[in-house]
A protein has these predicted regions:
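Glycan-recognition and catalytic cores of secretory/periplasmic carbohydrate-active enzymes
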Residues: 1-393
Length: 393
């Protein structure tokens, strides 16, 4: 496994993070550019997204925590300062969805998903450095979500609200999503940062929130017939249950496992481990013989999106390494290694750096989508590298 760990460190440092340090830093307006397209062209006047910047903060903070390189601390601090100075809403709390290239608020809605990633980034910076300001911001954002986005009547977290925390008509994260008032994706990316915050801020109120989120996954989001996670719901937790998202399933399997491990409750862990193994088995329906994982299955019409998106492969690898580490299932190790070989051959851009967005169904590289942008950040792939470096498997 040492060879695999060495490979991960090399890819992390010389393919992923080096790209963001040399290509994406915005020296004129601060922070990082909002977009580098699939042909490596920088778009210096592109809007800057909260999710992208929070994920940059997380990635460099985590890299510094593990590797202790000063250039990673410098980049993490750059991201922290930018999110603090330009995305934090000092008047109403929470963070803006986007700012323009000069840092002026552009879309001021409060998307719970984005606030979750800000907690993830600030809590990781605090974990890596002990910085009190970063921890205080993460705690404040946690309280913003609990005060405004948590629905105590129906349980669960509301997808989006206006800047002033009032109801909003269009709650979608992106044009591809259904307009549901609560989604699996947002709940996944709330439990993930809450778990990380718990590592540095162990309080009963946060533990209660996390345990409730686990219950939401097992009681509301999990499809008891298929063991896939259903994606979109209304206030009463009614949904079409018509999409199977393999990448989200395998990502949830290891993130929910991580949460149970961090809470350190043996009875809870036993319950969650039985469930996450079933979720991972369901996710494996998306595997192909080369170890790669396809994107989605729409049960209406039985159609598949056969793209091999970069982030799905990252979560596929972590999820199967997690299963091998804790349950010693050799086939899961082989799946992870096969998927990594696919990534190394097809998705890594060894000439220009970073990873391509996807390999299309016809086998061609997807260059229509970004190398760096609103939804393309050094998060899934740097986390995959760091997970494989840090874990004992």
């Amino acid at each position: 496994m040492e060879n695999l760990k060495e490979t991960m460190r090399d890819v992390l440092e010389n393919n992923i993070l080096s790209y963001w340090l040399t290509k994406v830093k915005d020296e004129e307006n601060g922070g990082f550019y909002g977009r580098v397209d699939g042909n490596d062209q920088v778009h210096p006047e592109a809007e800057k997204g909260a999710v992208m910047n929070a994920r940059i903060l997380w990635a460099f903070s985590a890299a510094y925590r593990v590797l202790k390189k000063p250039e990673y601390l410098e980049a993490a601090t750059r991201a922290k300062d930018y999110v603090r100075d330009y995305f934090l809403d000092r008047e109403y709390g929470g963070i803006y969805w986007s700012v323009d290239y000069q840092g002026n608020p552009l879309d001021t809605k409060k998307q719970t998903y984005a606030i979750g990633f800000a907690i993830y980034g600030f809590s990781e910076y605090a974990r890596a450095t002990g910085d009190k300001e970063a921890l205080d911001i993460a705690i404040s954002l946690y309280h913003d979500i609990e005060k405004h986005a948590f629905d105590a009547e129906n349980n669960g977290y509301i997808e989006a609200l206006t800047r002033e925390w009032n109801p909003i008509a269009d709650m979608r994260l992106s044009d591809k999503d259904e307009n549901g008032s609560r989604t699996m994706n947002t709940h996944l990316h709330i439990i993930e940062p809450y778990t990380n915050l718990y590592r540095v801020w162990k309080t009963l109120e946060l533990e209660k929130s996390i345990r409730n989120l686990l219950d939401i996954f097992t009681d509301k989001l999990l499809n008891k017939e298929t063991y896939h996670l259903d994606l979109f719901f209304n206030d009463e937790w009614e949904g079409k249950r018509n999409i199977e998202s393999y990448g989200h399933d395998i990502e949830a399997s290891w993130l929910l496992h991580e949460t149970a491990l961090v809470l350190d409750d043996k009875i809870l862990l036993h319950k969650i481990e039985r469930i996450i193994r079933r979720i991972a088995d369901a996710a494996d329906e998306g595997l192909r013989p080369d170890g790669s994982m396809v994107y989605e299955h729409w049960k209406d019409g039985d159609k598949y999106d056969l793209q091999r998106q970069w982030w799905v492969q990252c979560e596929n690898i972590i999820g199967h390494i997690d299963l091998y580490q804790y349950f010693r299932t050799e086939e899961h190790l082989q799946t992870a290694i096969a998927c990594w070989n696919y990534v190394a051959k097809h998705l890594l851009d060894n000439k220009n750096g970073e990873w391509h967005w996807a390999i299309l169904e016809n086998g061609m590289v997807n260059k229509e989508d970004d190398k760096a942008g609103f939804w393309k950040c050094p998060y899934h792939n740097s986390r995959m590298c760091l997970e494989l470096i840090e874990r004992d498997y």
